[in-house]
């Protein structure tokens, strides 16, 4: 089915899309994925600060590099996470694998 105001899930993303467009940055699938990436990275940074085994990862440079993953998050990144999710059938696990891929670069 082709997307139009008549085939939208609700009037918010259909008829009122132009009035609610700014909300997409917070309530879209893309936003959900982006903020999940942010939460996972901030959790990891905090963990690295508290666990002696990970303490060497808690450098300022590493923190900046990690935060760059979500600060420069793109539509391509979200698409990659959806690709991973199609294999894992788990959205949060897909985010974890995506971050691991970024670590490996």
Region roles according to the model:
Residues 2-105:
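A helix-coil-helix interface module used to build multimeric assemblies
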């Amino acid at each position: 089915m082709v997307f139009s105001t008549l085939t939208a899930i609700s009037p918010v993303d259909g008829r009122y899309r132009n009035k609610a467009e700014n909300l997409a940055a917070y309530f879209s699938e893309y936003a959900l994925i982006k903020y999940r990436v942010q939460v996972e990275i901030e959790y990891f940074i905090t963990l690295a600060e508290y666990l002696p085994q990970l303490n060497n990862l808690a450098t300022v440079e590493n923190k900046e590099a990690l935060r760059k993953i979500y600060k420069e998050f793109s539509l391509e990144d979200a698409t990659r996470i959806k690709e991973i999710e199609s294999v894992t059938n788990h959205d949060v696990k897909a985010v974890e694998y995506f971050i691991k891929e970024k670590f490996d670069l």
